[in-house]
Regions:
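Conformationally flexible catalytic loops at phosphate/diphosphate-handling active centers
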Residues: 147-202, 206
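Thiamine diphosphate
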Residues: 1-110, 117, 153
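Generic detector of well-ordered secondary structure
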Residues: 9, 48, 138, 144, ...
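Short, solvent-exposed polar/charged micro-motifs at secondary-structure junctions
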Residues: 44-45, 131, 159-160
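Short, solvent-exposed amphipathic alpha-helical segments in soluble enzyme
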Residues: 23-25, 73-76, 134-139, 164-167
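A very general structural signal that marks isolated residues within well-ordered alpha-helical segments
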Residues: 52, 142, 204-205
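Conserved thiamine diphosphate
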Residues: 99-153, 165, 176-181
């Protein structure tokens, strides 16, 4: 529904169910699922996938979210759209994998070094998770930035019935690609009527 093309992750409770389901369902729609060797590689993989034009996402929990911070900062600086899901669990360090917590809000805002804005959404039930996941991808593409989705262990492990809209009824923001002639300046922020910015279609990445 959100247009996800690529997922890279590393198993960590209580976010593992996201990876397990996507490993089955994402390839059916032509997407790519990769289990990486660690959390840092997972974040770097979705950055690389996004540079090629794919809508990309990873999912983790507190300790893994800490490891991803340097790469998240790079994605912010380089204006690379992607989505990071943090299914929060209790405690510092390894913590309590099956204990609910909402303690990573400050880290979502100020987890990396330097000063930058970040978009973070949080959901309290699965209907919100569905809607906010779509919104997260749209915001990432619109503002050319990583977007963080914060859930907790309760949301991560519970099951609910959802009201699923028709896919055609969901507005999706797609990336605008352009190309320029050699020797011509590229201006991604030139005003457009739709207020969207373009990305340079580089053969080095695609």
């Amino acid at each position: 529904y959100a247009g996800l093309d690529f997922f890279a992750g590393y198993p960590i409770t209580p976010s593992t169910e996201i990876a397990e389901l996507l490993s089955l369902k994402l390839p059916r729609k032509g997407g790519k699922f990769i289990q990486m060797e660690d959390e840092i590689a997972s974040m770097c993989a979705i950055i690389g996938a996004s540079l090629t034009g794919l809508k990309s996402m990873t999912a983790t929990s507190g300790p893994g979210f800490s490891l991803k911070q340097e790469a998240i900062g790079y994605a912010v600086m380089a204006e690379i759209p992607c989505v990071i899901v943090n299914v929060q669990r209790g405690g510092p360090s390894t913590g309590l994998p099956t204990s609910p917590s909402q303690g990573d809000v400050m880290q979502a805002r100020w987890g990396t070094h330097g000063d930058h804005a970040i978009i973070t959404l949080t959901a309290s039930n699965h209907q919100d998770v569905f809607a906010m996941t779509v919104e997260a991808f749209n915001l990432a593409e619109t503002y050319r930035t990583p977007v963080i989705l914060l859930f907790d262990e309760v949301v991560g492990h519970m099951r609910e019935k959802l009201q699923m809209p028709d896919p055609e009824e969901i507005p999706l923001v797609e990336r605008l690609w352009t190309s320029v002639k050699e020797g011509t300046d590229f201006h991604p922020y030139l005003p457009r009527e739709d207020r969207k910015s373009t990305r340079l279609n580089s053969s080095h990445y695609s």
